[in-house]
Structure formats: structure tokens, C-alpha cells
Curated annotation (Swiss-Prot):
Annotated organism of origin: Salmonella arizonae (strain ATCC BAA-731 / CDC346-86 / RSK2980)
UniProt subcellular location: Cell membrane
Stored SUPFAM superfamilies: FMN-binding split barrel, UbiD C-terminal domain-like
Topological type in the membrane: Peripheral membrane protein
Record-listed E.C. numbers: 4.1.1.98
Name of the gene: ubiD
Cofactor: prenylated FMN; Mn(2+)
Class of enzymatic activity (EC top level): lyase
Residues binding prenylated FMN, per UniProt: I175, Y176, R177, R189, W190, L191, R194, G195
Annotated family: Belongs to the UbiD family.
Name listed for the protein in its UniProt record: 3-octaprenyl-4-hydroxybenzoate carboxy-lyase
Top-level division of the source organism's lineage: Bacteria
Amino acid sequence: MKYHDLRDFLTLLEQQGELKRITLPVDPHLEITEIADRTLRAGGPALLFENPKGYSMPVLCNLFGTPKRVAMGMGQDDVSALRDVGKLLAFLKEPEPPKGFRDLFDKLPQFKQVLNMPTKRLRGAPCQQKIASGDDVDLTRLPIMTCWPDDAAPLITWGLTVTRGPHKERQNLGIYRQQLIDKNKLIMRWLSHRGGALDFQEWLAAHPGERFPISVALGADPATILGAVTPVPDTLSEYAFAGLLRGTKTEVVKCLSNDLEVPASAEIILEGYIEPGEMAPEGPYGDHTGYYNEVDNFPVFTVTHITQREDAIYHSTYTGRPPDEPAVLGVALNEVFVPILQKQFPEIVDFYLPPEGCSYRLAVVTMKKQYAGHAKRVMMGVWSFLRQFMYTKFVIVCDDDVNARDWNDVIWAITTRMDPARDTVLVDNTPIDYLDFASPVSGLGSKMGLDATNKWPGETQREWGRPIVKDPEVTARIDAIWDELAIFK
């Protein structure tokens, strides 16, 4: 599914009945959230609010409100095809040299895709068609949404933050929420382990007291947005990955006030800096847990330039108790994670992040168990292999005769194959999401692993139960007369 920018993608969605234009005036303060939430829960289309009250700029919401639209954004026709994206990422994470001519021929499609990695640098770009700087910078002209009644202030949610550490060629792209506190100031809420925050810390060490340049893209093309939330290998830039998804090189342009490169076709670009030591209290905000988070201090982003396209579109979302867009993204990206995990742990059969588990806080793994203690190895692997699962609190490991995506199966395995004392692993003092107020200390808490596999010798001293298996001859005889019985007619 080919598209060039966000506007191309919206045209594709509209052609397939996946976009609804709302002409009725609707307020970005709470009302858009209410409409978007009802629409998402019903599996409805992306929404383009053409007349937000008090603003001349339309608001796009629910862009990734169904797994199908996430797949479309990644250049695929359906969610199942995202396994192929995961296989490509697994290959790029640990590429294996061809073992011969036939193997080289088999790998040619992957190598061909890699050729689309480099970015294409432009001298001028649509995102710089209109420029505001100095006193003309006014973020209050943007239709920034207030999502929940007790939110502290309007909040930018889909901002693609672009940073670069002082000793790095590669830029980092991250999505961090940003609270509006003045006409030219936002609070950059990034956690200490995230790429943007790490770049900032390295900058402070290398250039003490100097301003840290930063840019934020709003309304980038879906491939670039999704590249920022996908487990891209450290050796691959998010722009390069977006090019792989799109099938064409990502076009970028140098910012006006710094050397950062931003998506050329983005709707809006915010350029500016973080002054070392300038912090502000952020929050509270309703979040993906279904609760308001605690107030905490984060750096202040001062905006010196706003550049944008003619007739720009403001892309936004809301987060709340699942289902919301992050939960839908989790369902779709789940399919990307499976091949990556399987490359490292071939014994894994399936991996599932239930959306009701707030996208990542609980994982179910099914595996082909091969030795005593094997389930615990996989459990530890899930927590440590990908950064995306650093905050996963619960990991349930089952045998391959269990359907990881069926709670009836999973609960049966837990209640019949587990001894709570023997098969529960508790790990204390581990990284935990700062939004998780259930942890005893902000950012630090425990994890639980549940080994719901059949136990091998060495794991138990008792004879293990024999599973009930139907007599196949009886099953065949009843199959032959089933329709004649007419039980459900």
C-alpha cells in the first residue's frame, strides 16, 4: 500500500471508507475526546474534525483506531502481514550472511528492501511553506486538545520529537507528550531511559550550560510515526525503517534554527531548545491506565520557530483506560514482536499482549518446552531482550497446547499446572513505568512470572497428571451421525 505523506494516506483511507469528515463545530476541549472514544470503541473510522471551535486548523483523530489502519500505515493490507515486518526487523537486528547462491537468492528481497534505507535530503520542503518565529510564535493558535476533565492543560500527544546526542550521527525519534504552559513553551515529558532523554543527558555532559536543540514534527506520515514506536534495531534509524515500510526513501529537510532533520512532508514543525536546568511540574493527566498520573518535574521546551504546510492538519489523540489508540497499536505491533522474539528464542510459539493489560503490562507466552527450568529462561528473556518489555509486570508462560490468546485456555493452565510457591517468580527492584502508581516507589517496582507449563522431572517429585484424550474411533462414529441427531435444529 503506497503513499507519500499523511495527506496521501488520508485519501486512501477515505477511498476505503476508513475516514469520516466531521463538519459540525466540535470543541477540542473534551468534546473531541468523547466523540473519538465512542468511535474507537465501535471500531469506527479515523475522524477529521474540519471545524474545531475557536480554530481554523482541522484536527485529525483516531488515525490508528483499528489494527487494520495500523497495518495500512505500515504498508500492509492486513494485520497478519505484520509478521513479515517483524521477520524483516529480526533479520536486520541480527543479519546472517548467505550460506550459498540459493540462500543469497532467497535473501534478495530482504537485501533489496535494505537499499531503501537512506534518507533523501531536500533543500526546501512542504513543512516550511509558512514560517513563524520570535514574537509570532503562538502555540495557542493550534487546536491542542484537552482530553479529560481534570487534565492540567492542553496536551500535544502525537508529537514526533527529534534529537541527536553530541557524539552521534543518528538522530533519535520519540513520541513524548507535551503540556502547553505558554505561547512558546511546552513541558517535554520523557522518561530517563528514553532516547531523547539520553541524548539530552549526553549533551549536558559534553556541553554544560548550553542549550539543547530539539524539534518536534506534528502530522508526519504514518510510516515515520510508527517507526518511532516499533522495536527498530539500534543500528537502524527510524527514518530508514520508515523508508522500508513505505518502499521509498524518507524525505527530510534541515530545520531553520538547528541542524536536525525533520520529515519534509510533516504538517507542522516546532523548532527550539531546552535550557539546562529549566524544569516545570507536569500533569496531572488522564493516561492509558485509566487513572490520572502524579505531578512530576520535566524539562521545558522553548519553541523559537513554527513552520507548517499550507492548510495544515493538526494530528492528535487521547489516552485512557483501554481500548484507546495506544492499546490498538499494541494489538497490531504484537504481530511485529512475535518473529523478533522467535529469532532469539525459537522455542516460542506465540506471544500475546492482551489490550486490557494496558498494552504491555502483562504478556502471555506459549513455547515448546525442552528441559526443566526452560520456562523461567524464556520468562527472563522476555523481560530483557527488547526495551519495549522493560515495564512488563507479569509474564505467563504456557506450553504450546495452550492458546495464548484465549483466557479460558490460559486460566486452565494456571490453575492445573502451577503450584503458587514453586512456580511463581518474583523479582524486586526492577524498572517500572512511572505512571504505575501501584509500585511502592516511582519508577521502581517488582515483576511476577508465572510458570504454567507441564512440569518435568527435577521440577516436581510427583507423577504428573495424564491428560484426558478422547477415543478417536468414538469421535469418528459420532461425527458420522451428528447431523442426524439434530440437537441444535
